[in-house]
Design a protein with these regions (language model features):
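Soluble catalytic domains of enzymes that build or remodel membrane lipids, polysaccharides, and related
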Residues: 193-404
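Membrane-embedded alpha-helical bundles of multi-pass enzymes
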Residues: 1-191, 388-391, 398-404
Length: 404
């Protein structure tokens, strides 16, 4: 239960202090409690945290993957257990080798937890989701994103919760520290960020909320195209640049149909599009002002590519979803439009903070296109937006985000 309590710290709930309670409980149970059920405590906490926190995955599997409820739950459990094991094993190893003294607890627990966090960034393509450092958004600590990043704030939280366990017998210090943190986390951010003295650019974000089922149904294609053209024409009266979401239409940017559509747009257009290059299918961003394309570098497993494809492809309908044979892009791109340069990012790309940091060095702003309708009204789109906002603050650069 206490693992699931920690999920309340993230969007859409944003009760920040819940994660402090959750992690303090975990570390206390593992390293200070006389309870011999360490394995059970760790597994149940991990399942509550990852199972509830990433429950949005089941929405895309069940509703849009055309998989039975039982099959959806089974796949979701397999994916959740993968997250759990990656978190579970290093903590269990630490429990086996640590000497049960306060100074060791303070030294080793935060260190191991932050190593696990780094590992999740890189292992099997990476899944840096539900990081403790995310909870400091919209608090006075938000200013630290630009100084020490998400990982630095995660480390500070790990040190704090380990200190809670060390100070457990000293109730006065424990209460004072936690009261201060609770009040400060509940306080609004008073520091300005992303203030720019540059030229003002008017961008219009076109988000028609297209049903994913209809997008791949030819009976609806003309209506979807007309909606994009109509909304863009209305927005073009005041906007300098138009931004469409990720892959808003089911054909490639090279097709005659897409070229004709783009010609009907009155202003510079930045949009997600499928693209076909050198025999490979990509999830891309196109710029109507330039020939170059940006190809998404962080593909979503089981959605845009199928791991172990020779074994899994065709096993169930979920593994044959449209456009699930994408190729990964191999380099960042900086794009230019009449009002400056921007770093393009597609959907899951925005989650990888270190990659984004390297991309934005000479850009005026970020543009992130996404298609979060695959996850309905679950936690996923809210958590995704939360992470996107943090990327902007970390790099002190404005972000434009269009999602369907």
């Amino acid at each position: 239960m206490f693992g699931s309590i920690g999920v309340l710290s993230f969007a859409p709930f944003s009760f920040k202090y819940a994660l402090v309670v959750s992690y303090t409980y975990l570390i206390y149970k593992l390293f200070r409690s006389n309870d011999n059920r360490n394995l059970n405590n760790l597994f149940l906490w991990s399942f509550g945290y990852w199972g509830i926190g990433t429950s949005w995955i089941i929405v895309s599997i069940y509703y849009y993957g055309n998989v039975s409820l039982l099959g959806s739950i089974t796949l979701f459990l397999i994916l959740s257990i993968g997250c759990i094991i990656f978190f579970f094993l290093p903590i269990l190893l630490l429990k086996r080798v640590i000497i049960n003294k306060s100074n060791n607890l303070l030294l080793f627990v935060p260190f191991i937890l932050i190593l696990v966090e780094f590992g999740r960034y890189y292992f099997l393509g990476g899944f840096p989701w539900l990081l403790p450092g995310y909870i400091f958004l919209d608090t006075p600590y938000e200013i630290l994103y630009g100084l020490i990043g998400v990982s630095g704030l995660s480390l500070l939280l790990y040190i704090f919760v380990a200190s809670n366990v060390v100070l457990y017998s000293n109730k006065t210090y424990l209460l004072a520290l936690n009261l201060f943190l609770f009040i400060s986390l509940m306080s609004p951010n008073i520091f300005e960020s992303n203030k720019s003295d540059g030229d003002i650019v008017n961008l219009a974000i076109i988000q028609p909320s297209t049903d994913p089922f209809k997008k791949f149904d030819n009976d609806y294609l003309n209506d979807i195209e007309q909606e994009f053209v109509s909304l863009s024409s209305q927005a073009a009266e005041k906007a300098d640049i138009l931004v469409w979401p990720e892959a808003p239409l089911p054909y490639t940017s090279e097709s005659a149909r897409s070229q004709n559509l783009i010609k009907n747009i009155e202003k510079p257009l930045i949009s997600g599009f499928f693209s076909y290059q050198d025999g490979n299918l990509y999830n891309s961003i196109i710029n109507s002002e330039q020939e170059i394309k940006y190809n998404k570098r962080k593909l979503v497993p089981f959605g845009e590519y199928i791991p172990f494809e020779s074994f899994l492809r065709g096993l169930i309908s979920f593994f044959d979803m449209p456009m699930s044979n994408m190729t990964r892009g191999d380099s960042p791109k900086q794009m230019n439009v009449g009002y400056g340069s921007f770093s393009p990012l597609v959907c899951f790309d925005i989650v990888f903070g270190e990659m984004v940091r390297k991309d934005v060095k000479s850009s005026n702003y970020l543009i992130n296109v996404s298609n979060d309708t695959w996850f309905g009204n679950s936690f996923g789109p809210y958590q995704h937006l939360e992470i996107s906002r943090i990327r902007s603050i970390e790099n002190n650069i404005p972000i434009v985000r269009a999602t369907n």
